[in-house]
Amino acid sequence: KVAIIGGGLSGLVLARNLDDSSKVTVFEKSSGVAGRMATRLVEPFEFDHGAQFFTARSEAFKNFLLPYLEKETVVAWNPKVVTLEEGKKPYKRPWFETHYIAQPRMTSLVKALGAPVDIRLNTKIDEVFKQDNSWSLKSAGKTIGEGFDWLISSAPGNQAFEIFNKSGITLKGLDEVEYSPCFALMVGLYSELSLGFDAAVVKNSPIKWIAANSTKYGRRKEKALVIHSCNKWAFEQMNEELPHVQSLLENELFKLTDVSAKDVSCIDMARWRYAKVERE
């Protein structure tokens, strides 16, 4: 028996690889799987507010993707990409390798992986302990799984450290993993607005990325924008209230594009504390 903490891509890939030889249970603290490959629905809009795309560089990962490419759960994304900078003319930014997305939303790949797996949602593991050569897990002070031969965490290093440290287990180096954060601003527009790009890399701004989510293959037609902040800027703003950060990013978006406040139908925010690994 194997227990895996975390229902993101890495946790569910591992679960599927072990599924033939072991009885696997995945424990996920959120209401759905996907982790940083998340999609948020704010009717009638949808936003891939986590990972925007992924690349495949190793032969192992390319082979892993083949069945999902055949089923079109994963497709190549070929957007018109530009570089934006306030006060300067945008210029085209070519991509020199294939970029992939899951469809009809980024969660689709992880959900396909997790379909045959025993997944316990809304289950935040806060303590683990070993007794008689088997592992047990606690959530909200109650034992919710026991008798596991192996325990594996795919959670961010800081979260895994908290779980194991509380349990009196020291894993060398786990508390030394460093992450940088990111804010995601999600903007739904009343109607079609010509931005002149499908995606933009932004320079010298609190914003580093803008994507017209609705231009991705298989997405809803409602015009939806996903804006990611710079990691360094996000770190500096990490303890600010979300409405304040939202206002700053919103104003920056208006400066960089033809979007204005009157175009905005809905707006939402997300705070990614563990967006990017800086040091392992």
Whereabouts are the PLM-identified features?
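N-terminal Rossmann-like FAD-binding beta1-loop-alpha1 element of flavoenzymes
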Residues: 1-26
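Glycine-rich FAD pyrophosphate-binding loop
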Residues: 17-42
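Central helical "cap/lid" subdomain
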Residues: 34, 144, 148-198, 259
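N-terminal FAD cofactor-binding segment of flavoenzymes
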Residues: 39-82
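Short beta-strand to alpha-helix junction loop
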Residues: 53-59, 88-112, 239-248
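A conserved short coil-to-beta-strand element within the FAD-binding core of flavoproteins
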Residues: 121-135
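Active-site substrate-recognition segment that forms the wall
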Residues: 186-238, 243-258
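Flavin (FAD/FMN) cofactor-binding core of flavoprotein oxidoreductases
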Residues: 247-248, 254-280
